């Protein structure tokens, strides 16, 4: 069953160049259907509009043309049905871990005992239960991202949106979190859309890897990753999938450079 539909979405903005303004399309005519419980990774050249699209999906920005439909209803703004996890955590460092995870539930006026129960359930899932009373500033970068994911999941969103959440982490911590995220996804059956510039990461996580063109960002290729889980980054059986994604990205770079050369 389709959970999320992106229908002919274009996002434009004006860029000032001296006394003139130039209309720029960040993304153009993007169409994508994401099934319930599917894990979709978005990759593409820097500046191709992946994060712009994610902001539109979250309701943080509006498309210039087209629409996003979640569970049959147009997305018109933010809400607990679609939660974003960013590269830089948005945790409150002066609060304890448990208070950060409970924060959204408190805003939603969930009864205190119930919200503590839910928060502890997800901290346990993220292997952070024993750090519930620690302060955020006492945690490592990887642990902070786990808290961010737990805080997003406690609200039971329809779609979890992740914008390069592991980009700032060291490779060892990232690889560990890649496995943990797959296990959590299997337990919760959440629909996840994950933006990354890392090919290995995308193939390790995604049911599909959606490759974007250079700006204006359009969908160039959908690559299905039909392989068992949990996946490890070191698994040689994933290398063919990685090569497919790399080929599409490199061919896009070559095509883009040729177009620029042909202009002269």
Task: Show which residues each predicted segment covers.
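Short helical segment in ABC ATPase nucleotide-binding domains corresponding to the A-loop/adjacent helical element
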Residues: 98-106, 116, 224
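A short, proline-enriched helix->beta-strand linker immediately N-terminal to the Walker B motif
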Residues: 154-158
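Conserved ABC ATPase "signature" region
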Residues: 106, 113-131, 183
